[in-house]
Amino acid sequence: MRTYYIFSSGRLRRMDNTLALELETERRVVPVEDIDHIYCFSELDLNTRLLDFLAQKQICLHFFNYYGHYSGSFIPRESQLSGFLLVRQVEHYLDQAKRLELARTFVEGALHNIRRNLEKREYDDICSKLDEIREGIGKTASIEELMSLEAHARKAYYDTWEEITGWEFGSRSKRPPANALNALISFGNAMMYTVVLKEIYRTALNPTISYLHEPSERRYSLALDVAEIFKPVFVDRLIFRLINLNMLKETHFDTNVNFVYLTEGGRKVFVKEFEETLEKTILHRKLKRNIRYKSLVRLDLYKLIKHLLGEEKYSPMKVWW
């Protein structure tokens, strides 16, 4: 399945049994049969007829504003429903011991993958610090304590980024991102979130019931939980590569008063390489066959379902390459 990116302002509408993107000077026909995501990075006019058509075709539509900040997603009605699984999801949230167990596994997976990013870069002192923090995961008594532990680990991790990239970083700033590296992280994390959200939609999991992040209105918090595991592998490694290979430069960023954002050219570079990353293949050690990177997300969700159903303990994806 393909992902379609829209960077030009215009109107997206249904035309017979396909899509038409009407720009100021041309009309582009967009076949829908092999598309599962559409990303919009510009002003776009659409109507309910289009949304109904996208829902029929099970196509997700993701919106980013002028500055490349994630605004939200149109997600079709759930195609795979399981009342029993929903009950089990809720049970694991309401039972604090079960919730904490799952939340710990998300953090453990994330910190393992963070450490792997540093192992070959001779950051032995930081790796040792991460090991100490990971040893404390099983001792945490609350979600708040666990998230505080994760925050300390990420700070130690981010302290290496200026040396790895050669770019100014300082500290992590999200709303708004204070410099180019922070803008890249925020943009990449938003892209990862949408990938996980789409994969959740392909299962019977409810994306609003989560364990590490607190469920709340107006967000699919389970996608945030699972994305923690994959951000170090799909996003952080890509950022290092784009900068170290000089594919992204500081000219790919603009500053608006008190924050920095990717230009359209910068976003195009990132999404192109991000798509290629998702399509890469790796020999899966357990399945003994090559699978695409983005398939790792779906496999992780299936493992989570088995855990919720009491069939098998959940073990998050831990990068081995």
UniProtKB/Swiss-Prot annotation:
Tree of life domain: Bacteria
GO molecular-function term, one example from the UniProt record: DNA binding
Q: Which UniProt keywords apply?
A: Antiviral defense, DNA-binding, Endonuclease, Hydrolase, Magnesium, Manganese, Metal-binding, Nuclease
An example of a Pfam family matching this protein is Cas_Cas1
Q: Which residues cross the membrane?
A: none
Cofactors demanded by this protein? Mg(2+); Mn(2+)
Q: What is its EC number?
A: 3.1.-.-
UniProt family annotation: Belongs to the CRISPR-associated endonuclease Cas1 family.
Q: What interactions and quaternary structure are annotated? A: Homodimer, forms a heterotetramer with a Cas2 homodimer.
- What is the protein named? CRISPR-associated endonuclease Cas1 2
From which source organism is this entry?
A: Moorella thermoacetica (strain ATCC 39073 / JCM 9320)
